């Protein structure tokens, strides 16, 4: 079994993991950033809506997002649009943004390991001191002084340590990114009501003048909709 020693092991190379890795390695901490997929942001699980101030705070380049200045909210019977003189929100190019953050972490000294799926958390007196991960058909041991769980919904580290259980409340959804002509690129739409989504909402988030994300999400267990039936 191959073995590595790091000050810090971070599980998950999403925005939280990459940002934590960048902050730590910028201070001279040796960091291993582990991503189970074959590439960062191989699978996207968010529509990318956020505030422009937050994007700028994290140094996200303008090429990674589409500014939004109009916000339309719709129900089956009413609708309202709120407008700002200047954009206050953005829709991220999620894949490009996540990969930018991971690249920034690597440039600061972080070692990124992709296709690296954590299967065991190593402990010493109930303190996490590393992980064992599956890489292709082999296993790799990562020793660490500290482990940070940034694996999102799966929470592989904290669940292994008994610090968290399976989420009892969560959201699930489906989304398509589509091409369309003359998209109103500075406006996003949120739709609420049982006709659109039981215990949830639907959305149209423009990513450019000719592309948009169209999706629907529900809350569980508030909605009894069979998750396998979610479609757009």
Language model features with spans:
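Beta1/beta-strand and adjacent pyrophosphate-binding region of the FAD-binding site
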Residues: 2-14
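N-terminal Rossmann-fold NAD(P) dinucleotide-binding loop
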Residues: 17
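Glycine-rich FAD pyrophosphate-binding loop
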Residues: 25-44
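Short, hinge-like loop/turn segments at secondary-structure boundaries
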Residues: 48-52, 165-166
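A conserved beta-strand/loop capping segment in the N-terminal third of enzymes
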Residues: 51-100
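Helical element adjacent to the flavin cofactor pocket in flavoenzyme catalytic cores
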Residues: 92-118
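Predominantly flavin-linked oxidoreductase catalytic cores and closely associated redox partners
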Residues: 108-229
């Amino acid at each position: 079994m191959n073995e590595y020693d790091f000050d810090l092991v971070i599980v998950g190379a999403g925005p939280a993991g990459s940002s934590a890795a960048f902050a730590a390695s910028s201070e001279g901490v040796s960091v291993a950033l582990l991503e189970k997929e074959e590439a960062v942001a191989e699978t996207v699980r968010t529509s990318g809506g956020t505030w422009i101030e937050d994007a700028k705070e994290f140094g996200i380049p303008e090429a990674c997002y589409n500014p939004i200045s109009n916000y339309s909210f719709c129900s089956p019977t009413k609708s309202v649009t709120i407008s700002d003189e200047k954009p206050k929100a953005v829709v991220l190019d999620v894949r490009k943004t996540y990969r930018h953050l991971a690249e920034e972490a690597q440039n600061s000294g972080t070692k990124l390991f992709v296709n690296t799926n954590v299967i065991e958390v190593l402990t010493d007196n109930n303190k996490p001191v590393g992980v064992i991960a599956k890489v292709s058909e082999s296993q790799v041991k990562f020793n660490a002084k500290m482990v940070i769980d940034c694996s999102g919904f799966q929470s592989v580290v904290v669940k292994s340590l008994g610090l968290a259980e399976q989420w009892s409340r969560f959201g699930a959804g489906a989304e398509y990114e589509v091409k369309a002509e003359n998209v109103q690129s500075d406006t996003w739409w949120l739709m609420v009501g049982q006709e659109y989504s039981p215990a949830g909402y639907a959305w149209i988030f423009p990513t450019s003048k000719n592309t948009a994300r169209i999706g629907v999400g529900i809350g569980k267990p508030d909605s009894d909709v069979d998750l396998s039936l979610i479609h757009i």
